[in-house]
Design a protein with these regions (language model features):
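Core dinuclear metal-dependent hydrolase active-site scaffold
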Residues: 2-75, 118-186, 241-248
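Solvent-exposed loop/turn segments at secondary-structure junctions
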Residues: 38, 57-60, 81-85, 106-108, ...
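Short amphipathic alpha-helical segments
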Residues: 64-66, 88-91, 113, 172-174, ...
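Short, conserved loop/helix-junction motifs that constitute active-site signature segments
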Residues: 69-71, 92-96, 176-180, 199-206, ...
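Di-metal (Zn2+ and/or Mg2+/Mn2+) metal-binding site signature of metallo-dependent hydrolases
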Residues: 71-96, 105-106, 188-198
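Receiver (REC) domain switch-region micro-motif
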Residues: 73-76, 99-101, 184, 209
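Binuclear metal-ion centers of metallo-dependent hydrolases, dominated by the metallo-beta-lactamase
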Residues: 97-149, 172, 208, 213-248
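Catalytic cores of nucleophile-dependent amide-cleaving enzymes
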Residues: 181-199, 205-209, 213-218
Length: 248
């Protein structure tokens, strides 16, 4: 019964703020999980800034993002180099005041490196207000596993894990700040290679898990992950079903 009540209250809040017009951009602080198809783009809208946690996907709601963020300082946090997490940089408006607060680890293709080089590094990243860890380096490989190099960030109770696989989860999920997470953005869009039992055991205070994915084409979130989340009695929301998800 407690789970049902928690889900109902949270659903009401989501419906309320999902209907909030973007013209009220100065009314409150909130976070938006954008419906970008298969990919990830989450924006924390604040009084004088927008913080973007990955900027990738199959499509981008540029008009809505512009309404909220074009007149503010934009901080970009990139978990790793995969295109469905960084692709928005290719069309990023040059007129916006923007900097990279967290670049991906290591190097990538010449094209991606050149694209990232267009942006200045942030001088003020407000590190005390967000936490990150760098997964163990994988040694000298010709083709490193970029998913395993995903950087993990918690901001305002929301846990962003990039495409971090189960093996890497076992390393960073023991950090002391992980259990305080209230919202989990599913790793690797809900792939069966992420969101382990160990991680869910470590995040018992979760109010909701969110899948930024497209099941119709990619079968994410995977049925095994959905079942795992259900066993832990964590409500699961999907951008494919809800559209943009607003969190206050």
């Amino acid at each position: 019964m407690a789970w049902i009540v928690r889900f109902s209250i949270f659903s009401f809040l989501l419906v309320t703020f999902s209907a909030t017009p973007t013209t009220e951009k100065f009314a409150r602080k909130y976070m938006i999980v954008w419906n970008v198809g298969q990919g990830q783009w989450v924006t924390s809208v604040e009084e004088f800034s927008c913080r973007h946690f990955d900027v990738g996907g199959e499509r981008f709601p540029w008009k809505k993002i512009a309404t909220l963020c074009r007149d503010k300082k934009n901080f970009i946090y990139l978990s790793h180099w995969d295109w469905d997490h960084i692709g928005g940089l290719a069309r990023w408006p040059s007129s916006w005041d923007t900097c990279i607060a967290m670049p991906p680890l290591g190097q990538s293709s010449a094209g991606k490196m050149k694209m990232l080089a267009r942006f200045a590094k942030c001088e003020d990243t407000r590190i005390k207000k967000w936490k990150e860890i760098n997964p163990p380096q994988l040694g000298k490989r010709k083709r490193p596993d970029t998913n395993a190099l995903s950087q993990v960030v918690q901001y305002k109770g929301v846990l962003f894990t990039g495409d971090s696989p189960v093996k890497a989860e076992s390393e960073w999920s023991n950090q002391e700040w992980v259990p305080s997470s209230r919202v989990l953005i599913l790793g690797h869009h809900g792939s069966r290679t992420s969101t382990s039992e160990h991680l869910l055991d470590r995040t018992r205070n979760l109010n909701v898990a969110i899948a930024s994915a497209r099941y119709a084409r990619y079968k994410h979130p995977h049925a095994e992950v959905v079942a795992r989340i259900k066993r832990h009695r964590i409500p699961l929301l999907k951008t494919e079903d809800w559209g943009n998800i607003w969190l206050d």
